[in-house]
Amino acid sequence: MPKNALIQAFHQLEAFKWNPQEGFRLASGKNSPYYVDCRIVLAHPHSRHLVAQLAYHLLKSLDFTLIGGLEIGAIPLATGISDYGYRADPQREWRTFVVRKQPKDHGLGKLIEGTIHPGETALVVDDVLTTGGSLIKAAEAARAQGLIVTHGLVVVDRSEDEGKSNLAQMDIQLLPLLTLEELRQTPPFVR
């Protein structure tokens, strides 16, 4: 199964780490005994393919035309899903967009790169959900450009109430591929 293979890839690539003594400082500012490094997973073709495959099967019944998120982390995730979707069904052209952390200070000064049109429906993506901050920033930027954002996909949901609550307040339904608990409960990691 692709899900089990992806979980194993996290362990084989050492993209899931545990350090109960010192922990890890997360992008949210929180400290956690667990660290999930999706950049490593998305840097390998096989595991990137597994992510895209799982995402495609989760998303194919939804109605949206765009996939995007914050630079840099969302780029391989959005393009991988978009490419997989097109190969699986050439009628499905999920275009991608990238939300810059800051608008460019030259050229057109864009905050969002990609071909977007007000009224289109967009899916926002991120690697890991803790507080939901990155998904929310991407959704706010997309909505400011007239896009409709109703769903957010993450590779790993850390299953913290704050993230789900923050997304719910923004009317964004969470679609996780994996949970932290699934990574923790799978050999060789079981402690």
Place the predicted regions along the sequence by residue.
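PRPP-dependent phosphoribosyltransferase catalytic core
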Residues: 2-12, 140-191
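Short glycine-rich phosphate-binding loop at a beta-alpha junction
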Residues: 63-73, 153-154
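Active-site-facing substrate-recognition patch
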Residues: 1-62
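Short acidic, glycine/proline-enriched helix-loop-strand junctions
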Residues: 61-62, 77-94, 165-180
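Short helix-loop-beta connector
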Residues: 60-65, 117-119
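Short, glycine/charge-rich flexible loops or terminal/linker lids adjacent to PRPP-binding catalytic cores
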Residues: 77-123, 133-136, 188-190
